[in-house]
Regions:
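Primarily heptad-repeat coiled-coil rod domains in cytosolic scaffolding/tethering proteins
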Residues: 6, 10-13, 42, 49, ...
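Charged, amphipathic alpha-helical oligomerization/scaffolding segments
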Residues: 17, 21-24, 28, 53, ...
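Charged, surface-exposed helical/loop "interaction arms" that form contiguous linear patches used
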Residues: 31-77
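ATPase nucleotide-binding head domains, primarily ABC-like/P-loop NTPase cores
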Residues: 82-314
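Short hinge/gating elements
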Residues: 3-7, 22, 37-47, 118-123, ...
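Switch/coupling subdomain of P-loop NTPase systems
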Residues: 1-49, 101-103, 112-114
Length: 344
């Protein structure tokens, strides 16, 4: 009967012997399975150390092939390693962006200057640039190739610190500024001369005057520690700081005022400008309003912006002339080659 007693099972006498035989065969089958497994276990146990060793080797081989496959997909190269804590990225591309769409950039740090201050408009590529540097540093230290041109040089840091993005904490009731400052305090406690520090919108989220002053003081502290640092900002005070302090350099993300769109090109040695007045004029804001707005800005700032605008115009003109000269050089070389071929 069943365990509940509600059902009775009847076995005809004619199949009792066959059922007993079936039961015996099932038991024999189970015993044979256990015997075979025990024998196989014994065989495996005798070479267990070899199997475990091979497993480790296969894992390393799989990892190496995976890195190679990733390198091919990113069109990456093996960076030259240096011990001087220098970064020299040639046509570096953010590894997570479409390789056919991302704009390559030349980024260098540590040889002529230890701190790079990047300015420019929002959505111009500042954050992508500093993330590229941070990812390249971590990829290098992980034994990965980097998506850049041959001749790019990287180094190994004891730590790569980064404060990027706006991570407000509702649970801890932290504002944007407090959230950033909490991270920065932790970074300054741990930073050494062998560290790379990355700040995004340093000093943002509070009064601009106090924020700029704090940003300068923080950069000075990082410099005193001897670390390499890249920071993005909108503050003119930081541009002036980079212009006047040794081992600190300005950089800007290029913006095309005519098309009102960023080019995503990084220009090291050139302070960026907000382009707010030019953009507003292009969008139709009346000139007298723009002129009135300029009256509310410190005269020194206006003069600096005018100088930057002239520098940018001269740079663009020089870039165009250089491109034309290179094209002319190619045409001359082609004509010379054709002439030499005909003489032969």
């Amino acid at each position: 009967q069943s365990s509940s007693g509600a059902t009775l099972f009847i076995e005809p006498m004619s199949i009792v012997e066959m059922n007993n035989e079936l039961r015996k065969l099932k038991l024999d089958e189970q015993e044979e399975i256990e015997r075979i497994l025990s024998e196989l276990t014994k065989i495996v146990g005798e070479v267990a150390s070899d199997i475990l060793s091979n497993q480790v080797i296969l894992g390393k081989l799989d990892f190496a092939f995976a890195k190679g496959k990733l390198s091919l997909a990113m069109k990456a190269i093996e960076p030259i390693l240096n011990e001087e804590k220098h970064i020299n990225i040639k046509n570096g591309r953010h590894p997570l962006l479409d390789v056919n769409k991302v704009v390559p950039n030349n980024i260098y740090l540590g040889e002529d200057f230890d701190t790079l201050v990047i300015t420019g408009p929002n959505t111009g590529g500042k954050t992508v640039t500093i993330k590229t540097v941070g990812l390249f540093a971590l990829m290098t230290q992980s034994g990965l190739h980097i998506p850049a041109d041959y001749g790019s040089s990287m180094c190994v840091y004891d730590n790569v610190f980064a404060d990027i993005g706006d991570e407000q904490s509702i649970e801890q009731s932290l504002s944007t500024f407090s959230s950033h400052m909490t991270k920065i305090v932790g970074i300054l406690k741990e930073v050494t001369s062998d560290s790379l520090v990355i700040f995004d919108e340093l000093g943002a989220g509070t009064d601009p005057v106090e924020g700029a002053a704090l940003a300068i003081a923080i950069l000075e502290d990082v410099n005193m520690a001897g670390a390499k640092c890249i920071a993005t900002t909108h503050y003119s005070e930081l541009k002036n700081y980079a212009l006047t302090k040794p081992r600190v350099e300005n950089a800007a993300v290029e913006f095309d005022v005519n098309t009102l769109s960023p080019t995503y090109k990084l220009l090291i040695g050139v302070p960026g400008k907000s382009n707010a007045f030019e953009i507003s004029r292009k969008l139709g804001l009346k000139d007298y309003i723009i002129d009135r707005a300029k009256e509310f800005i410190n005269t020194d700032n206006i003069e600096l912006e005018d100088v930057l605008q002239n520098v940018e115009k001269n740079r663009i003109k020089a870039e165009q002339e250089r491109a034309e000269a290179e094209q002319l050089k190619k045409e001359i070389e082609y004509i010379k080659t054709e002439y030499d071929r005909k003489l032969e």
